[in-house]
């Protein structure tokens, strides 16, 4: 299909809007292996091979191996979506527009996690509201990395709120932003980097040098999305009922850098301020207590309903992105 660059961007934008709708309606189908799982399998396999090839080469060898891993994953996952999209066009040439739109829209939906975050976090909310603490503890363990066995009901609710607030950026706004500019390949490239960071981006003896390139690349890619997420959530606090926009703005500006990562606290700070909650703080991971600064003010006791409110902020932020993209497509 012959299209101008503007027409091509509009087409990718329309596919992204379709992907948002698909994600809202069906989320991630359980019967379909998710691309992020495949990314994880590839990262683990490539890590083993690269470590064998660079065994005994020291810090520089580990750093080079990590850079090769990152570059390889980025190239592979940049190409895969375009291959799928063009395969759809070749298989159904008479329906090229529809086939491309459907293929792109479905790929985009797989890169967005709004429905998945909502579904899993609301399991925690409903369990807590029903008084089923052990069930809530199990449900929250499915979406957080910390040790949940030491959490009381308030700690369980807080962990769920933090997860929604933090992942609103790397699970929703960031992939949306990359796909808005670069099509579905932008989303898969971003997710590949984000998955690498979650697997090898640790500052420990095993990954300090091997995972450094992936961790820094992830920090770079999330600079704009994380800050945009915080701003959108502050706007949501001004509009949504039961939230405090003034306090959200205050806490966002004050606490958005209270994290070891330069990008992780922006959404949490806006959410904490909007709900007058204190989030973050010390947490147990694999039997070790990790000291972390608090985010927000301890103005009131956290409640299960705050999980629902955090989801409202996430959907509001995504909704503004959808509205902005739709307006641009119509006026350009």
Where are these regions (language model features)?
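Glycine-rich phosphate/dinucleotide-binding loop and adjoining beta-alpha-beta core of small-molecule
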Residues: 198
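Hydrophobic alpha-helical transmembrane segments
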Residues: 1-189, 193, 201-332
């Amino acid at each position: 299909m012959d299209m101008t660059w503007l027409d091509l961007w509009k087409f990718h934008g329309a596919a992204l809007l379709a992907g948002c709708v698909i994600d809202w309606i069906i989320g991630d189908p359980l019967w379909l292996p998710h691309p992020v799982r495949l990314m994880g399998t590839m990262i683990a396999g490539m890590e083993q091979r690269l470590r064998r090839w660079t065994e005994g080469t020291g810090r520089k060898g580990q750093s080079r191996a990590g850079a090769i891993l990152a570059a390889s994953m980025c190239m592979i996952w940049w190409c895969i979506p375009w291959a799928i999209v063009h395969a759809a066009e070749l298989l159904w040439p008479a329906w090229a527009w529809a086939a491309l739109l459907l293929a792109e829209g479905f790929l985009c939906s797989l890169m967005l996690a709004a429905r998945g975050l909502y579904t899993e976090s609301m399991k925690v909310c409903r369990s807590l509201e029903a008084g089923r603490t052990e069930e809530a503890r199990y449900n929250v363990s499915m979406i957080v990395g910390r040790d949940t066995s030491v959490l009381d009901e308030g700690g369980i609710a807080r962990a769920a709120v933090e997860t929604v607030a933090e992942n609103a950026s790397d699970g929703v706004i960031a992939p949306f932003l990359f796909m808005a500019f670069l099509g579905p390949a932008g989303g898969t490239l971003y997710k590949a980097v984000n998955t690498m960071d979650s697997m090898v981006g640790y500052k420990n003896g095993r990954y300090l040098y091997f995972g450094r390139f992936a961790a820094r690349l992830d920090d770079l890619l999330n600079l704009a999305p994380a800050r945009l997420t915080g701003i959108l959530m502050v706007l949501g606090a001004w509009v949504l009922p039961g939230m405090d926009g003034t306090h959200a703005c205050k806490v966002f500006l004050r606490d958005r850098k209270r994290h070891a990562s330069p990008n992780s606290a922006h959404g949490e700070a806006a959410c904490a301020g909007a709900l007058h909650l204190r989030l973050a703080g010390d947490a147990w991971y694999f039997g070790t207590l990790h000291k972390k600064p608090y985010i927000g003010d301890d103005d009131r006791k956290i409640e299960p309903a705050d999980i629902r409110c955090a989801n409202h902020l996430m959907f509001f932020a995504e909704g503004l992105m959808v509205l902005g993209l739709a307006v641009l497509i119509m006026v350009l």
